[in-house]
Regions:
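The feature captures the beta-strand-to-loop junction immediately N-terminal to the Walker
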Residues: 47-49
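Helix-to-loop junction immediately C-terminal to a conserved catalytic motif
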Residues: 62
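Conserved ABC transporter NBD signature motif
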Residues: 70-81, 87
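Conserved ABC ATPase "signature" region
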Residues: 121-139
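Conserved ABC ATPase signature
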Residues: 143-147, 151
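Catalytic Walker B motif of ABC-type/P-loop ATPase nucleotide-binding domains
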Residues: 168-172
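Glycine/charge-rich catalytic "coupling/switch" loops of P-loop NTPases
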Residues: 250-294, 317-343
Length: 343
């Protein structure tokens, strides 16, 4: 398929689409995903405990592991066929445990370029640029075996960046690294997304997930489960002795006072109370909005309310009837400042 055709497919289809996916090790199921769409562009973060299936899913998306059943499509092409070539040509996976060859940092970072026949002068430039991007300028002559764990992880990331992939697949890129390396990795991920690239990464560190994600996918025992928190992007307006005021879209949210330049506010869905009129409550956040969607989930209803920013609340069916929840209905959303966490 031509590059033009691939581009047209990418514009109308998700980056990855999974149907009926099953994977097992030693006869034990490790992935059971009936349907999953990973969007093109931005940062998709897979979260879950160790053993939840995050790494297995990434390896399947990269074509490194064949599922026992089901289908995976990359930009509309089956990964079992023509899509595998397209995916491998446009994506790079960085594994959790850094693997470097003997030799210099520059030789490691330039390895993928050399085997692709890239001219030496271009390799030198791209190696220098990718090392600069991960905060390791001038590291090219150093011995790879003399690096710290955080530096090794950053060199592996630089090796991937040198190939200029459209898609980065990162398995626990911030695990077991120093805070400085963690900040660099997070910056690289954000920069890739801002530049129009796609990043699919895994982590069990929720603070990292909240800071980076455009889409959050939670895995439990190999299954995708719905997130139960509102993840709101915005900025701090001001902080006084009692509260930090966080602006998300058209909503101003009060949080416990914290100093810092936070970009994300997280509010659990089950902390939101819906009512037709303002409640007599000590809760400091009271936002008026309009119901835009009502979905069933595990015996509850997930209600979306546009309050200048869309908030989702979990309510019981009986409470929904009592309140009169319906699409188009105006409601008041109430929650405590202490329910809000900033990242």
């Amino acid at each position: 398929m031509s590059n033009a055709a691939l581009g047209a497919a990418a514009a109308s289809t998700p980056l990855f689409e999974v149907r009926g996916l099953r994977a097992a090790f030693d006869g034990k199921p490790v992935l059971e995903i009936d349907s999953l769409r990973i969007p093109e562009g931005g940062v998709t973060v897979l979260v879950g405990e160790n053993g939840s299936g995050k790494t297995t899913l990434l390896r399947i998306l990269n074509g490194l592991l064949e599922p026992a059943a089901g289908s995976v499509h990359f930009r509309g092409l089956p990964l079992a066929g023509e899509g595998r070539t397209a995916a491998r040509a446009r994506s790079v996976m960085v594994h959790q445990l850094p693997l470097l060859f003997r030799g210099t940092v520059g030789q490691n970072v330039g390895y993928g370029l050399r085997i692709r026949g890239v001219p030496r002068e271009e390799i030198v430039d791209r190696v220098a640029g990718s090392l600069e991007a991960v905060g390791l300028p001038g590291f090219a002559p150093r011995r790879a075996t003399a690096l710290s764990g955080g530096e090794m992880q950053r060199v592996c990331l630089a090796r991937a960046l040198a190939l200029a992939p459209e898609v980065l697949l990162l398995d626990e890129p911030t695990a077991n690294v120093d805070p400085g390396s963690r900040s660099v990795v997070e910056r690289v991920v954000r920069d890739r997304a801002r530049a129009g690239g796609s990043v699919v990464m895994s982590t069990h560190a929720m603070e990292t997930a909240y800071r980076l994600c455009d889409t959050l996918l939670r895995l439990e025992a190999g299954r995708v489960v719905e997130p139960e928190e509102n993840i709101l992007r915005g900025a701090v307006e001001r902080t006084d002795e009692q509260f930090t005021r966080f602006r998300a879209g058209g909503a101003l949210i009060l949080c416990p006072a914290r100093q810092g330049q936070f970009r994300v506010a997280v509010v659990p869905m089950d902390e939101l109370i819906l009512s037709r009129t303002p409640l007599d409550s000590s809760a400091r956040n009271r936002l008026r909005g309009t119901v835009t969607a009502v979905e069933q989930t595990a015996g509850l209803l997930r209600v979306s309310i546009d309050c200048g920013v869309v908030l989702k609340a979990l309510v019981t069916p009986s409470a929904a009837v009592e309140i009169g929840v319906a699409v188009g209905r105006d409601l008041v959303v109430t929650f405590k400042a202490s329910a809000v966490r900033l990242y």
